[in-house]
Design a protein with these regions (language model features):
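Active-site-proximal beta-strand elements of phosphoester/diester hydrolases
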Residues: 66-75, 92-99, 149-152
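Accessory, non-catalytic peripheral segments of nucleic-acid enzymes
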Residues: 174-259
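Active-site-proximal segments of metal-dependent phosphoesterases and phosphodiesterases across multiple
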Residues: 5, 76-79, 86-124, 135
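Conserved beta-sheet core of the metallophosphoesterase superfamily
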Residues: 106-178
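Core catalytic region of metal-dependent phosphoesterases/phosphodiesterases
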Residues: 1-60, 119, 123
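Short, conserved loop/helix-junction motifs that constitute active-site signature segments
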Residues: 13-17, 85-88, 117-122, 142-145, ...
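Active-site environment of divalent metal-dependent phosphoester hydrolases
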Residues: 25-38, 62, 76-79, 99-104, ...
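Divalent metal-coordination and catalytic microenvironments
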Residues: 8, 26, 67-69, 97, ...
Length: 259
């Protein structure tokens, strides 16, 4: 869409103006059912023609400064993935956008995949995209040649299916094979409040200032719901009530995100 092109162009340019920026393709950047179609990133990158913007589109080995990057691209298949033993370099970093076996969703479901952690042995760091929940699947172990494997998660909350917090960037310490999570402040979001027995949860007021509000109610009357809404709207007048559910049980996504 025109909006997508505009936003991505500004994002890539602004990042590249600050620091060398490396991007790889994700499943939403192309049509995996028709591999002859052009991905949406290529024309944007070519049009920007920014000297600090690098698009590692295809599976391969990319030497950048003193780091050896290896890409497993979204068009490739597991049997063709480059193994660490076939790559030379003091620091080997694998970039992959896809599901790794036993990675978790925001609801706590473990996902199956043909891509196993063992297939990444020998790399030093593995930087992942695709799964929106921030998580570290494995810590670095130099003795057993196990890389640190991490999903940095979505940049900001995308919908009600994601926790309000736990979004941002991972700042990597290449030398120590470690990272620091940097939370990106966001005034907008999708807030969910669980009303049980007519009571607000203790931490109900840690909501984004703006965005959409969803109430999930259990054992709660209409009168109690109206009272709760009045309290919430008084503190967060810019939140828009969009959904109301009556449920038998609730799952706290922000608590799940901490696991």
């Amino acid at each position: 869409s025109p909006e997508l092109i505009d936003q991505l162009s500004r994002l890539f340019k602004n990042l590249s103006d600050i620091v060398p920026t490396i991007i790889i393709a994700g499943n939403h950047d192309c049509n995996l059912n028709n591999l002859s179609r052009l991905d949406c990133l290529t024309p944007i990158v070519e049009n920007l023609n920014h000297p600090n913007l690098y698009y590692f589109k295809d599976s391969g080995v990319y030497n950048f400064a003193d780091i050896t990057f290896v890409v497993w691209d979204v068009w490739d298949t597991e049997e063709n993935y480059i193994q660490a033993k076939d790559v030379e370099g003091d620091t080997k970093v694998l970039l992959y956008h896809g599901t790794v076996d036993q990675s978790a969703t925001d609801l706590g479901f473990k996902l199956p995949s043909k891509v196993k952690l063992e297939s990444m042995d020998g790399y030093d760091m593995v930087m992942l995209g695709d799964i929106h929940k921030m998580q570290t699947l494995q810590k670095y172990d130099s003795v057993d040649k196990k890389p640190i494997v991490r999903y940095c998660g979505s940049l900001v909350q995308q919908n009600y299916g994601e926790a309000v917090y736990g979004h941002g960037a991972s700042v990597w310490d290449v030398k120590n094979r470690s990272f620091e999570h940097i939370e990106i402040p966001n005034d907008f979001g999708y807030a969910t409040i669980d009303i049980i027995d007519g009571n607000l949860p203790v931490d109900w007021d840690t909501l984004p200032e703006k965005g959409r509000l969803r109430l999930r109610c259990k054992n709660t009357t209409e009168t109690q719901i109206k009272k709760v809404l009045s309290i919430v709207k008084d503190k967060y007048p810019k939140l828009t009530e969009s959904k109301l559910y009556k449920v038998d049980s609730v799952i706290n996504l922000d608590e799940e995100a901490k696991k």
